[in-house]
Amino acid sequence: MTEKKYIVALDQGTTSSRAVVMDHDANIVSVSQREFEQIYPKAGWVEHDPMEIWATQSSTLVEVLAKADISSDQIAAIGITNQRETTIVWERETGKPIYNAIVWQCRRTAEICERLKRDGMEDYIRNNTGLVIDPYFSGTKVKWILDHVEGSRERARRGELLFGTVDTWLIWKMTQGRVHVTDYTNASRTMLFNIHTLDWDDKMLDALDIPRAMLPEVRRSSEVYGQTNIGGKGGTRIPIAGIAGDQQAALFGQLCVKEGMAKNTYGTGCFMLMNTGEKAVKSENGLLTTIACGPTGEVNYALEGAVFMAGASIQWLRDEMKLISDAFDSEYFATKVKDTNGVYVVPAFTGLGAPYWDPYARGAIFGLTRGVNSNHIIRATLESIAYQTRDVLEAMQADSGIRLHALRVDGGAVANNFLMQFQSDILGTRVERPEVREVTALGAAYLAGLAVGYWQNLDELQEKAVIEREFRPGIETTERNFRYSGWKKAVKRALAWEDHEE
């Protein structure tokens, strides 16, 4: 009898590193998770220690195999999914980072972005990379590191320094520096990659003065990139066979592989992606055009809207405002009041993402009267997640010309029934919550498993996509539109709050 085989997904997120073991029926066998430190050197700056990312991720891999009581020779393949855009530069020789990882949320490169706009680069960037000029993406972060670490640009030119997003960093460490690769989905988030020619863009590299020698090789999201022998008992070399940025992995894990299928992930931020097939749809409504995975991990395109603050705004209620002691309590308190009593919370703590793209917006609470209590504010904070999702969905429907009939949802906050019902109410659309919530890890596992023949094709996976609960709209159109118009008014007043040089 042959030994049972499994797939491991490594899910390197913004606040924690996780490892998930899955069996052939896409059941979760074991999970290991470790949080790591968030570093805030200045207001609006966010960093991680790349060595801590590696330490937490590698230890979860060892731990998850021990928990499942399986040896490394029972692992058919490893798939990697990661927080996107987060930028690491390290020495080729030693594997040591020259600076902390600059995280996707970090706004320190706003001035570099203003300069790109002044240089008339907006249309070029939108047309060739699919992105908008914003500190969110990796390109300006790489430039910042090269500008601020003495001698680094010259070293990069000599081939002594390497750049990578988190996937690239992990694979470099897992293969002891033998493999320097990324996949199309992660490359498409750097603002350095041409999504039409599927190659690094020389004009962008020149504009940001980034030597091409630093950049990883870009490969498909489902193929064998290299082998690793990390991971507990048994010294087998395990193929690393799938890579996708977290949102594209979730889209694949939800099996949204056909044109017009969409999902929203409610994590630290909120991310809605709609697969547009083999056609790159240019957005006229502040969305991103990005690369997604087709049925076999090949290049498809997607429209994406990013909301920076979703679960993070609930953490704010807990950690800074001390209104709740546990994120799960937010649902209980929100349902203790019948509405928000006219209050809107705009959680623009680090600016606003799609479709506004205003790094100078700041958080605000509007509509406060004497009768407002903490429950109203908790409820309004939860509702803000649903309103921001509607902002994005409206833009998507306008760009693609596709009316969405159902939204698939995943991420930590989907356990909140109040939020899911309000989401359906405010969209006027069915919201489908899957049985397996770990869709990001699932996507990475599927991509890796397909690459090594563990699963033959997506048809094999379709029956595993069980919808656990469907939420349907429960309010009238007039009420829906009235509430949403209040949100629009609140956002308008939060825009451009921080002064900046014109």
From Swiss-Prot:
The keyword Metal-binding applies. Glycerol binds at residues 84-85, 136, 246-247. ADP binds at residues 14, 18, 268, 311, 412, 416. Keywords: Allosteric enzyme, ATP-binding, Glycerol metabolism, Kinase, Metal-binding, Nucleotide-binding, Transferase, Zinc. ATP binds at residues 14-16, 268, 311, 315, 412. PANTHER family: GLYCEROL KINASE, SUGAR KINASE. Homotetramer and homodimer (in equilibrium). Heterodimer with EIIA-Glc. Binds 1 zinc ion per glycerol kinase EIIA-Glc dimer. The zinc ion is important for dimerization. Key enzyme in the regulation of glycerol uptake and metabolism. Catalyzes the phosphorylation of glycerol to yield sn-glycerol 3-phosphate. This is Glycerol kinase.
